[in-house]
Amino acid sequence: MSGYSGGGKKMIAEIESPDRAPELYSPRFYGLANNHKHLPEMQKISGLEKKPMFTPIVDDYYNGMVVCVPVQAAVSGFQLEPERVQEMLERHYEGSNFVHVQPLKTPAEMTATKLSCNDLRDTNQMEIFVFGDAEQILLCSRLDNLGKGASGAAVQCMNIMLGLDETVGLL
């Protein structure tokens, strides 16, 4: 689920219009023909042979998003252990200035968790969450689609290419 700023000028104008249609006040699925513009890059980067199932949702807040990837043991062929997935992610992102793996939650904490989409708005931060059990895991990342998205990534990459600290202008 994403804020509407990533939808382009037309979507921004529709949602910010004082005369906007009632359906624009609630989350909306789009890209339902499985032809979203980011599918080719998702397939390539993930190494998938076939397009992934991608169900983007846009809501009426400006920026921020949560991206979730469900993984089922029966389909993946892997034995799922949330603790091992958590540890792997923590090792991978250890020392990262911008990506933070959140502590694994107990089943009771997972039941009580409400994962909002725009808590990291106006930042270049990303939080990764692991939910689930041995049968299925839900991997979620929360970020600002602008800050950690295209604009933040551009500044971070420019900093690295110029030999600057990657955090310049982003913290």
Protein language model features and the residues they cover:
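NAD(P)-dependent Rossmann-like dehydrogenase/reductase catalytic/cofactor-binding core
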Residues: 125-171
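C-terminal substrate-binding/catalytic lobe of Rossmann-fold NAD(P)-dependent oxidoreductases
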Residues: 2-139
